[in-house]
């Protein structure tokens, strides 16, 4: 399973689990995990290969991060 720019419903659009960036991200990358209108976790990593764990019922948002693939 993989995800790129957009908002993904965990358990519907993508599987729950740990996702990692396929390529090193730039300082324009932003990711966010939310439930409804509440942000659970977010980051602007600024580089490297960020890794994010998402659970069923959450939303996973990616902006300018390339593709994340389930590990």
Provide a role label for each language-model segment.
Residues 1-2, 25-71:
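Primarily secretory-pathway and cell-envelope proteins
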Residues 4-6, 10, 15-18:
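A glycine-anchored, Pro-Gly-centered beta-turn/N-cap motif
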